Amino acid sequence: MLLGCDISSISRIEKIYKKYGKAFLDKFLNSHEQALIKSPATLAGFFAAKEAVSKALGVGICKECSFFDIEIYKDSKNAPKLRLSARIMENFRIKTSALSISHDGNFAIAVAVLEK
């Protein structure tokens, strides 16, 4: 089992978004993920989630694992879920994944669990 955790400042992510707009979103979210963003808290949570997955893999965001190898979607109960690229699933031998995102005050935290 692989575990990764990340925390992001909602105000910091909001400040970057206000400065760069959609160009910032395009750096780490696909169009489906962008459609799910309803608030700065959600945006910070998605950023933290992708960082948490990359940490669980032990590589961070890099050539081996880009932001776009990790997709976040919502299930029928609006809970966040992960969809990893075939490249990640194969290279890291990942069988299942779980994701939790939470917000409190000015922070978003994400925990990713990957099972080999």
Residues covered by each model-derived region:
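Core catalytic alpha/beta fold that binds nucleotide/phospho-ligands
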Residues: M1-K116
